[in-house]
Amino acid sequence: MNQNKNYRVLFSNLYKDTQIQENAKMSEHINFRVGGPVDILLTPNTKEQIVETIKICKENKIPFYVLGNGSNVLVKDSGIRGVVIKLSEFDNIVRTGNTIKAESGALLKDVSAEALKASLTGFEFACGIPGSVGGAVFMNAGAYDGEISFVIKEAEVMSEDGKIITLSKDQLELGYRTSAIMKKNYIVITATFCFESGEKDKIEGRVSELTNKREEKQPLEFPSAGSTFKRPEGHFAGKLIQDAGLKDFTLGGAAVSGKHCGFIINKSNATAKDILDLIEYVQKEVKKQFGVDLYPEVRIIGED
């Protein structure tokens, strides 16, 4: 019996057959559209399934990776050994008054739409971020002068020892693209956001404005993971990359976007290696020309 069959046996009592995929192509599950296969991909739709899955993985020493919408991830060409737990089906959103509680697989744009429907303001910035709630809380995602830390009330997380705990906003220790969840290797289960009442017309106007701005300034027509690099203190990554003469620079099928140099795109059937080589080249050039270190915002996982 091969390893994948062993995995299927371990999880067969917990999942329907349709929730278990063997040798799933990760290129079909991440926005970059690259990456080799994972041994087993599971799509839980309940908290109990998530908790039990992680428990089984730990008890059997199976490596696992929790994936939201795959919007800020780069999977290497040889794929992932072990289990990927994809939370796209764990996506309920419930509004109570001025608060919205969302499961970690819920898309940010859907939470933003729910807020708009109830004339709640504060989440407009997230209307076009392609990520999920779990990933956004994990890295304190943000855009256009807004970020998760401005609106989150608390998050329900799973700690390394398998306990479900609730962390307040302060306990989440949200900073620029970082959090206590990231530092402690916790897993987001749900997040609760708190908003202010606003005027629906103004909220709609802001959402429309930001949507147009994204379409105008970001290379949405190509697969990417959004902003490739974190913002270096005192600088903008895109400006440094452009000033380094790297606009439209291509390596293999990967390219620095001519529309926004902060984005590395899959321009023409790129491999993960193409993208990683380009990331490294950009880092070296910016360091050489300006003495500034660029650090990837995208999470890189898998085997070479």
From Swiss-Prot:
GO cellular component terms, semicolon-separated: cytosol
Taxonomy, superkingdom: Bacteria
Keyword annotations: Cell cycle, Cell division, Cell shape, Cell wall biogenesis/degradation, Cytoplasm, FAD, Flavoprotein, NADP, Oxidoreductase, Peptidoglycan synthesis
Active site (UniProt): R177, S227, E297
Residues forming coiled coils: none
A Pfam family: FAD_binding_4
GO terms (BP aspect): cell division; cell wall organization; peptidoglycan biosynthetic process; regulation of cell shape
EC number(s) per entry: 1.3.1.98
Molecular function terms from GO: FAD binding; UDP-N-acetylmuramate dehydrogenase activity
Statement: the UniProt record of this protein carries the keyword NADP: yes
Enzyme class: oxidoreductase
Subcellular location: Cytoplasm
Tagged with keyword Cytoplasm: yes
Names of required cofactors: FAD
Protein family: Belongs to the MurB family.
Functional summary from the UniProt entry: Cell wall formation.
Protein's UniProt name: UDP-N-acetylenolpyruvoylglucosamine reductase
Species of origin: Clostridium botulinum (strain Alaska E43 / Type E3)
